[in-house]
């Protein structure tokens, strides 16, 4: 038997603010459902946590340190068998500049 291969477009969203990334994912899903696309997601991916340790004093007191952290939140949206209208609507989506978007196509 010859199975029909699925064409999948993956949209990966990255941001430091989880509220902003959830709003953007909802906006993308609303636009794509209007085109009749088959969508999976938003799927939360692991959050990357970076910790930076800095000395508080410029000269002495090595025991006195300050720690900062930066969390990068990620969401995955999959579009299964997209049509031309779906791809065109993806090109015209406007999102905040704080959102990083990565598109991948798998077959």
UniProtKB/Swiss-Prot annotation:
Domain of life the protein comes from: Bacteria
Enumerate the Gene Ontology biological process terms. Answer: translation
InterPro entries in the record: Ribosomal_uS10, Ribosomal_uS10_dom, Ribosomal_uS10_dom_sf
Could you name the Gene Ontology cellular component terms for this entry? ribonucleoprotein complex; ribosome
> Gene3D superfamilies attached here?
Ribosomal protein S10 domain
Q: Which GO terms describe its molecular function?
A: structural constituent of ribosome; tRNA binding
Output the Pfam families linked to this UniProt entry.
Ribosomal_S10
Write out the entry's keywords from A to Z. Answer: Ribonucleoprotein, Ribosomal protein
> NCBIfam families, per this entry?
PRK00596.1, rpsJ_bact
Name the family.
Answer: Belongs to the universal ribosomal protein uS10 family.
Fill in the subunit field for this protein. Answer: Part of the 30S ribosomal subunit.
Q: Its biological function?
A: Involved in the binding of tRNA to the ribosomes.
Under which name does UniProt file this protein?
Small ribosomal subunit protein uS10
Please name the source species.
Onion yellows phytoplasma (strain OY-M)
């Amino acid at each position: 038997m010859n199975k029909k291969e699925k064409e999948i477009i993956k949209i990966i969203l990255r941001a430091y603010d989880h509220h902003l990334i959830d709003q953007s994912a909802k906006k993308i899903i609303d636009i794509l459902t209007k085109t009749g696309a088959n969508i999976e997601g938003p799927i939360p991916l692991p959050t990357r946590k970076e910790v930076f340790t800095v000395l508080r004093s410029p000269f002495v007191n090595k025991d006195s340190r300050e720690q900062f952290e930066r969390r990068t939140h990620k969401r995955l949206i999959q579009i299964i068998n997209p049509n031309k209208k779906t791809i065109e609507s993806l090109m015209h989506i406007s999102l905040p500049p704080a959102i990083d978007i990565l598109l991948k196509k798998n077959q």
